[in-house]
């Protein structure tokens, strides 16, 4: 079984400078994975404005007079952007829709049309002090499809360290296949980052071996859980190969009679809060940060999701969030 396939990419845009930063990255990803790129623009429903016009008796019909002009201009803007940034072989379709909530419309459209990745700018026209604006943040929270959010200029050719966060739970390992695929594709190494929170964390249930110490006990347990996860997902061509050096291993990928390896490092830190430690480490060491998020209620799901959302709001580097499947939540 292949780790990841990215055949269809959806790029939401509001034509702001923030959303434009995603266009060249989408092209780079599409070239690498052989993907088709579709663009979508959501025109927010001007419900209250329409009602006010009617009350004032202004002779203007939103459906007949205003929306058609906005749609026509949006169509032209999308076509110009796709012509400027995308290669012909990666250029897909474009869509303009009128919806009440852009974030909900993006998530639903991506799910309905079986996209493999949503790739969007961290901030659009809704500029805020947070690095990921409200629309992007809501898409990250709600999407069942991986979301790749990019801010400043980003060159995939410079990727050296892909960082995957884990709280040691199986839910957090849902992001492992994509993180490993990215490291493999960009000839980078993968670093798994785990935080032992001072006031309790998911790794508390891991037995400590007094002869090895806390960090080594957690490290060995997580490596074992990853191999179990890969076996459960029938990814028989991928496994973690121990090197004999603590915290330094290899991800071995077998393709027929050929095999290749990805340098795989584990970093364990103690801290008051996971999101604070992740932000600090990722800002200094990571080129791409990959995290699992939630989408369900419940204490464990809330902790996993809120950590991902907090980190995604404030780190400057590209962030990819992956939501575990419903089956994984139910296990």
What residues fall within each predicted segment?
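Structural beta-alpha unit
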Residues: 1-4, 44-47, 64-65, 72, ...
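Small/aliphatic-rich secondary-structure junction motif
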Residues: 2-61, 161-219, 284, 314, ...
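Short beta-strand elements of ligand-binding domains
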Residues: 119-122, 146-152, 319-323
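Short, structured interface segments
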Residues: 134-154
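Glycine-rich phosphate/pyrophosphate-binding loop and the adjoining helix
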Residues: 191, 195-247, 255, 260-261
